[in-house]
Structures are given as C-alpha cells and as structure tokens.
Amino acid sequence: MMALRKTKPTSPGRRAVIKSVNSFIYKGKPFAALTEKKKKNAGRNNSGRITVRHIGGGHKQHYRIVDFCRNKDDIPAKVERIEYDPNRSAYIALLCYADGERRYIIAAKDIEVGSYLVSGSSSPIKMGNAMPIRNIPVGSVIHCIELRPGKGAQLARSAGSSAQLMAKEGDYSQIRLRSGEIRKIHISCRATIGEVSNSEHNLQSIGKAGAIRWRGVRPTVRGVAMNPIDHPHGGGEGKTAAGRHPVSPWGTPSKGSRTRKNKRTSNMIVRSRYSKKG
C-alpha cells in the first residue's frame, strides 16, 4: 500500500518533510544490463557556457533504459519487481518475458509483483497491458500514449497522470488529456491501460533546500537582484521593482504567455487546453 509519512520535527530540516513510504519498492540495485552511465555537465555546453540554468551537483545517477514502445507482442511477461527511478517521478517495473528477456516499463497504478502483463492487439483489457488504440474501448483510462505509430510513448508518462479515450472516428481517436486538451491521435498508436503509478508524488514535501541540491537543482536568483547586464529587471539604486511586466532573462513574458510554435500539428488539437471549461 502507498502511504505518506510525516517526520517528527527533530530538526528544522526534518520539520516539513513528507515522503512516500511503499513496502513494495525493491530495495536492491537496478538490473545492470538495462542501465547506462549518465554524465553530468552542470548545464554547460561543449564550450563551457551555461545553456540551462539551475543545474549542477547532485547525487550520481544511472539512466534506466525504459521500453516505451511495448512492441514485444503476445508474449506474457511477469512483473519481477517495482523500482524507484531517479530520472522520473513514476515508478518503473522490471518485466521478465517468457523467452527470458527483461525490460523496464513505466509501472501502472495497482500492478503487483508476480502479476502477468502482455502487449499486442489480442491482449486483454487489463491494468498495465499495452495495445493499439483501435483495440481499446471508448471511455477507458490510459497512459503512455504514442503520438506516432512505433515512435514510443510520449504522453501521460509522469507520476499519477492519465488520459481518457473519448471517441474513435475513422483512422483517428480523440483523447482528453489532464490539461483539458482534446487531441486527435491515430488509432494505430499504442497506449497502456490504467493510470501511472506513484499518484501521491505531488503530495510530498522536500522539506529543506539541501534535499533539492541532492537532486542536482541549484538556487534561482531573482531578476531584480541582478545587474542590468544580467536581466531586464536588474539594476536601480537600492531595492527597486522590476519596472515592467515579469519577463525571463531573454525578455519573454514569464507569467503564462503562450510560446507554442508548432503550427504543423495544430490541426490535431480538437479542443485547446486554454478554452473555457464548461
């Protein structure tokens, strides 16, 4: 069972900590054949310049190679264990297929160690099974959804996320995402039944600044505390306001301004996430 634990305030750093405690999470090391080294570059590019701010330090991590395609069809796989993955908010499950191959997948909510999963057009409608959208009943809750057939899951992959299959018309289905957006997706694209695991992720509290540093995140400096060369809000004598609407260091409005540029796929959006909810 998933549970949240609030620590006793034995120190200021422990006072605000709320963490999830799950007895089913595997305590050992990951499956070595499905891990890769992960080099840290502290947000710098090949010339040493900072290209992504607020990145640096943190605990050493290995990348887990996750199967987002789920293309090993009609071969049952046993859930050997469910693991923590430092690279994502969801848990991952190690599957052992009947032919001996092992793969990591995004763990669906309520799947258990020892249960069997299968992917393919003929697989039953069961939590954690993957299949083309054409084989999924309308109204089903799904996750790990492909945008192009065979490319691998791109939508609804983070902890607790899901989408709902609303309709099927011809070669396309209509899927409602958590944001409220309704999007057309080809029925040959694959999706997994159910909701993503670790739905209590958003209820956790890090508790102290150092725990964020363990994750490789560095502090964020306010623009008004900088010099004018560093930020549009910088400069001034003493403490001063920004003097303009909030913007990023590059002048882009930073409070909800839309920046989407991909007009090529705009015709696939049936209902925008910004439209008023009735």
From Swiss-Prot:
Mitochondrion listed as a keyword: no
Keywords carried by this UniProt record: Ribonucleoprotein, Ribosomal protein, RNA-binding, rRNA-binding
A cellular-component GO term for this protein: large ribosomal subunit
InterPro entries: NA-bd_OB-fold (IPR012340), Rib_uL2_dom2 (IPR014722), Ribosomal_uL2 (IPR002171), Ribosomal_uL2_bac/org-type (IPR005880), Ribosomal_uL2_C (IPR022669), Ribosomal_uL2_CS (IPR022671), Ribosomal_uL2_dom3 (IPR014726), Ribosomal_uL2_RNA-bd_dom (IPR022666)
Region (Disordered): 226-278
Family: Belongs to the universal ribosomal protein uL2 family.
Gene Ontology BP annotations: cytoplasmic translation
GO MF: rRNA binding; structural constituent of ribosome; transferase activity
Protein name (database record): Large ribosomal subunit protein uL2
Keyword GTP-binding: no
Gene that encodes it: rplB
One Pfam family cited in the UniProt record for this chain: Ribosomal_L2
